[in-house]
Structure formats: structure tokens, C-alpha cells
Amino acid sequence: MTKLGFTRSGGSKSGRTRRRLRRRLSGGVLLLIALTIAGGLAAVLTPTPQVAVADESSSALLRTGKQLFDTSCVSCHGANLQGVPDHGPSLIGVGEAAVYFQVSTGRMPAMRGEAQAPRKDPIFDEAQIDAIGAYVQANGGGPTVVRNPDGSIATQSLRGNDLGRGGDLFRLNCASCHNFTGKGGALSSGKYAPDLAPANEQQILTAMLTGPQNMPKFSNRQLSFEAKKDIIAYVKVATEARQPGGYLLGGFGPAPEGMAMWIIGMVAAIGLALWIGARS
């Protein structure tokens, strides 16, 4: 009997041990499955870190821009774009838009100190202008140029569709200096508003964005991008379209027209007086 009781007791203990072992194994398996699922969800839901890595072409563009800047610009604008007193302003915040306007119109690099840098043939080609602009943009920030989907500088796409609105905005904001036909005019202290005929669409836009020389800046709060495009369209039509009114006398408006009328009238009056005198 004792032996039988011992056997039953030992079997019972062995069964309980096996059940505990199975529970532990099943718990471990469930824990492993849960950890695997949690790890997978974490890997899927965790955003990939955004690491700013410049590609080789961008790095080459910036290196070229720095070389050109150090060669042609640093003496007036400083090694850190901070400007040099009595030589050149800071370029921090002007962006590639200012670089495009100043360099593509030949105003920069300036040949000499004067009241206003005139327009002339640029000394840099488009690729070099892009490189200088990229360098200034990367180190100083500011407004950028508008590009086509292929990366080229936008021009024709910057012309708006509402010429009437563009004309109204031009006469309200620009005609006091540039004349209502965009021919420009004299300002104080030897400065002047330039003729807009040679400017392309991008140059007109970047001038409005950056305010070169004495020109004010026009932010998007003052003139929306669409409003700027309408102004550009009006300027290009006014400077390119054939005028049906005969000889334009420079397109400067009432002043030369009044002078022409006065001269023609005086010549006619003198001629008439001489003819009357000869008849009598």
C-alpha cells in the first residue's frame, strides 16, 4: 500500500510539473510572438529619418559658385556675405533672385563706384550665374528664381493673362518712376529708373522681389504672384508690341509730345509770317 501511495503521489507531482512546463513554454512562445509583432509594427510605423545629403551635382555647383564669388564678389560683399562698409551691401537674405537680377543684367560685378550701376552685357554665362546664385542662396537664404519643370529659368510662363489688371497695377505702383510705357525716367542724385524694354520676364519678377537700387520691394502681401505676372505681361506687351499711333518720340509721354507740337507750331507760325510779309 505504501508503495502504491508513493507511486500515485509521484505520478501526480510529475503531471503537475509537466503542466507547469507547458504553461511556461506556451507563455514564452506567446511573449516571443508579441515581441515580434511589436517590433514589426515599430519598424513599419517609425518614420525614416530625413538626412540632408547633398548630391554630387549640388556640391559641384556650390563649389563652383564659391570659386566665382571669391574671385569676383568677395572684395565688396565679404567672405561671409556680410558686406563691406563703403564698398558693398550684405547679401544675407537677398537670395538667388537678387543674384540673378544683378548679374544677368550686367550690373554686377560693378566696374566702378557710381550713383547707379547701369545695365550692360553680363560677364558670366547662365551656368555661372546659377552657381553664384546657389552659393548665395545656400549661405544667406532669401527669395529664389522661378524655374520650369526641367530646371531652366522661367520666362514666357511668367506672363499673366489679365493685361488690363496688369496695366492698372503698373500705373499705380511703377509708372511714377518707369513712365507708363516702361521707358524709365530721371530720379534724384544722378539716379534713374531704367528702361524696361531689355528686361526679360524673370528679371522683372526678381526686381519686384528684391528691390534693386532705389526700387522698393513688393512682397506677396503687397502684390500677389499672380498680380506680378499680370504686371510682367503688361510691361512686355507695352515694350514689344507695334504701336499704331505713328512715331513714338521715345515713348516718354506728354513731355516730348508737347515739345514736338511747340516746335512744329513755331516753325509753322514763322513760315506763315514770312509768307505774309513776302506777299505784302
From Swiss-Prot:
Gene Ontology terms for molecular function: cytochrome-c oxidase activity; heme binding; iron ion binding; ubiquinol-cytochrome-c reductase activity
Main EC class the enzyme belongs to: translocase
Catalytic activity reported: a quinol + 2 Fe(III)-[cytochrome c](out) = a quinone + 2 Fe(II)-[cytochrome c](out) + 2 H(+)(out)
Membrane topology (UniProt): Multi-pass membrane protein
Chain residues that bind heme c 1: C73, C76, H77
PANTHER family referenced in this protein's UniProt entry, alphabetically: CBB3-TYPE CYTOCHROME C OXIDASE SUBUNIT FIXP, CYTOCHROME BC1 COMPLEX CYTOCHROME C SUBUNIT
Name the UniProt record assigns to this protein: Cytochrome bc1 complex cytochrome c subunit
Organism encoding this protein: Mycobacterium tuberculosis (strain ATCC 25618 / H37Rv)
